[in-house]
Amino acid sequence: MCCAVCGPEPGRIGEVTPLGPCPAQHRGGPLRPSELAQASVMAALCAVTAIISVVVPFAAGLALLGTVPTGLLAYRYRLRVLAAATVAAGMIAFLIAGLGGFMGVVHSAYIGGLTGIVKRRGRGTPTVVVSSLIGGFVFGAAMVGMLAAMVRLRHLIFKVMTANVDGIAATLARMHMQGAAADVKRYFAEGLQYWPWVLLGYFNIGIMIVSLIGWWALSRLLERMRGIPDVHKLDPPPGDDVDALIGPVPVRLDKVRFRYPRAGQDALREVSLDVRAGEHLAIIGANGSGKTTLMLILAGRAPTSGTVDRPGTVGLGKLGGTAVVLQHPESQVLGTRVADDVVWGLPLGTTADVGRLLSEVGLEALAERDTGSLSGGELQRLALAAALAREPAMLIADEVTTMVDQQGRDALLAVLSGLTQRHRTALVHITHYDNEADSADRTLSLSDSPDNTDMVHTAAMPAPVIGVDQPQHAPALELVGVGHEYASGTPWAKTALRDINFVVEQGDGVLIHGGNGSGKSTLAWIMAGLTIPTTGACLLDGRPTHEQVGAVALSFQAARLQLMRSRVDLEVASAAGFSASEQDRVAAALTVVGLDPALGARRIDQLSGGQMRRVVLAGLLARAPRALILDEPLAGLDAASQRGLLRLLEDLRRARGLTVVVVSHDFAGMEELCPRTLHLRDGVLESAAASEAGGMS
């Protein structure tokens, strides 16, 4: 979506405009980092469709899909963004699929660009038809001229076409259709006599039809995007895009509220706040209390009501402006090399002491490493280094320790400690953890109820129990010699798991504990049957789990990525495999996970983190799986939401005899749900002695 924020007065934030093309003031100048990122992504999509349409037999029609990403670029961005994407996609397609792939990209860029520009200018189908006919005539005339000049090439092409037609005629003759065979050869011979006119007609009609298909697809896509609330958009106000004074702090929020489009209630209730230069402010509150919404307002989004005063513009992502580090670093790390990512997006001519920044975040030894090989904690510290390279006056850290293990959390906190003194920046730290909030100069709580203000605490590592004695009950899952290697047989091969052996009994609760990069998620996907192990086997009732996908349900670490529908009832019905019209079954599924059935009519993007996890569980449990695997189920949840989710899972395990496997780097409060604990380190299950020694180190 493209949501522009308009505000004519420096230091004030204006109104949010509806979805549409990007503002006209961005038409000049070189490509900005956001435009370059969009061009890269869309170029990759266009190149993939063009390559598949050439190298896969009978897949030529897939080339039409390439008009959608190029059309979206033409609709939302400058023409030079589309040109950059076309050049990149064309080079990739040519290197892999030859001239056919290159021409597929060119056709997609032309047709997608045509439909996108027409859409952006508010014109309709007649304009598309006229424009495509003109374009078809130009393309056809160019092709006729080329073939007229290149006589030998023309004769070669016609010979190939004649051979194909003769083959078709011979096939028809064998089917006792001699008349049809003769007609095919006669009509083709007549067409060759008037080949310039046939070619012109072919290009005119063909491009018009493909343009109409692209127009329809782009219109459907934009219509669908309009129905998705713009929940976490970080577009800066237009004042930030000109040479205006950058001054994000001190900032004062006076009686600020925020409500997302089409929402029934405020996401952020009335709040007044001052953020002073050089201070460390912690923001705490329950899931759904508005912490992330407040972060968006501090980063430049306009409130629904109230005023936001600051001495200059927000300067989001600019030198001396505002920098934001989010809880999912994968979305912020764009460089392929660690050192490159630190300076990615900085203005030309800007110098940054990359070595000092990497040393500050503890990554000085990894400067030449591929960012794809970093652990979650290392990625988060890299994102922090890239933010600090902009020398921000205000740094916003939104739940940056949520997705990392205790070791990574300690490393991040060590970096954040004293950050305001080392860099003379204001630090706004949104967190659930008690020790993180305690280190702040001030703490702001967005929760009214005392029950929602308690913080997440850390706990001692539980004693490991990894014995594999004969089970008292029938085994639900059995892993025998499981090992897995990514990119096996290539120079980039990486071993994730080695010789994993254990049994999970029916109705058992097992915690698989390990740090970032230990192989926990790989093991979870193997147990769910979504990944086939390189060696060994994961068995359910004696059969490999990958042959019975769905019998073992998997809840992803990021619940939002598992929710594919727009509304709760549609999501639950789709995941469970029944019709959304069966509202009684939807209501029953929601009730099982402790949600009000009335929630079924709510949009997914209006849910809190805890509600999203429960909606995922509702859909999975409605399929009556033999076992349930949860990958980092407590990540991103406040203390109350964690307790509620754990109680729900404990009740389900006792009442249904449900087999539960939790994969997590957190273990606080897991004792009742998971009496048995396995420790995973570097892809290997550890013995009790080794695990205890590792925990003390």
From Swiss-Prot:
<keyword id="KW-1003">Cell membrane</keyword>
<keyword id="KW-0067">ATP-binding</keyword>
<dbReference type="GO" id="GO:0009274">
    <property type="term" value="C:peptidoglycan-based cell wall"/>
</dbReference>
<dbReference type="GO" id="GO:0043190">
    <property type="term" value="C:ATP-binding cassette (ABC) transporter complex"/>
</dbReference>
<dbReference type="InterPro" id="IPR003593">
    <property type="entry name" value="AAA+_ATPase"/>
</dbReference>
<keyword id="KW-1133">Transmembrane helix</keyword>
<protein>
    <recommendedName>
        <fullName>Uncharacterized ABC transporter ATP-binding protein Rv2326c</fullName>
    </recommendedName>
</protein>
<dbReference type="GO" id="GO:0005886">
    <property type="term" value="C:plasma membrane"/>
</dbReference>
<feature type="transmembrane region" description="Helical">
    <location>
        <begin position="128"/>
        <end position="148"/>
    </location>
</feature>
<keyword id="KW-0677">Repeat</keyword>
<keyword id="KW-0472">Membrane</keyword>
<feature type="domain" description="ABC transporter 2">
    <location>
        <begin position="477"/>
        <end position="696"/>
    </location>
</feature>
<keyword id="KW-0812">Transmembrane</keyword>
<feature type="domain" description="ABC transporter 1">
    <location>
        <begin position="251"/>
        <end position="473"/>
    </location>
</feature>
<feature type="transmembrane region" description="Helical">
    <location>
        <begin position="280"/>
        <end position="300"/>
    </location>
</feature>
<feature type="transmembrane region" description="Helical">
    <location>
        <begin position="86"/>
        <end position="106"/>
    </location>
</feature>
<dbReference type="InterPro" id="IPR017871">
    <property type="entry name" value="ABC_transporter-like_CS"/>
</dbReference>
<feature type="transmembrane region" description="Helical">
    <location>
        <begin position="45"/>
        <end position="65"/>
    </location>
</feature>
<feature type="transmembrane region" description="Helical">
    <location>
        <begin position="198"/>
        <end position="218"/>
    </location>
</feature>
<feature type="binding site">
    <location>
        <begin position="285"/>
        <end position="292"/>
    </location>
    <ligand>
        <name>ATP 1</name>
    </ligand>
</feature>
<feature type="transmembrane region" description="Helical">
    <location>
        <begin position="522"/>
        <end position="542"/>
    </location>
</feature>
<comment type="similarity">
    <text>Belongs to the ABC transporter superfamily.</text>
</comment>
<dbReference type="GO" id="GO:0005524">
    <property type="term" value="F:ATP binding"/>
</dbReference>
<feature type="binding site">
    <location>
        <begin position="514"/>
        <end position="521"/>
    </location>
    <ligand>
        <name>ATP 2</name>
    </ligand>
</feature>
<keyword id="KW-0813">Transport</keyword>
<dbReference type="GO" id="GO:0016887">
    <property type="term" value="F:ATP hydrolysis activity"/>
</dbReference>
<dbReference type="InterPro" id="IPR015856">
    <property type="entry name" value="ABC_transpr_CbiO/EcfA_su"/>
</dbReference>
<dbReference type="InterPro" id="IPR050095">
    <property type="entry name" value="ECF_ABC_transporter_ATP-bd"/>
</dbReference>
<dbReference type="Pfam" id="PF00005">
    <property type="entry name" value="ABC_tran"/>
</dbReference>
<dbReference type="GO" id="GO:0042626">
    <property type="term" value="F:ATPase-coupled transmembrane transporter activity"/>
</dbReference>
<keyword id="KW-0547">Nucleotide-binding</keyword>
<dbReference type="InterPro" id="IPR003439">
    <property type="entry name" value="ABC_transporter-like_ATP-bd"/>
</dbReference>
<dbReference type="InterPro" id="IPR027417">
    <property type="entry name" value="P-loop_NTPase"/>
</dbReference>
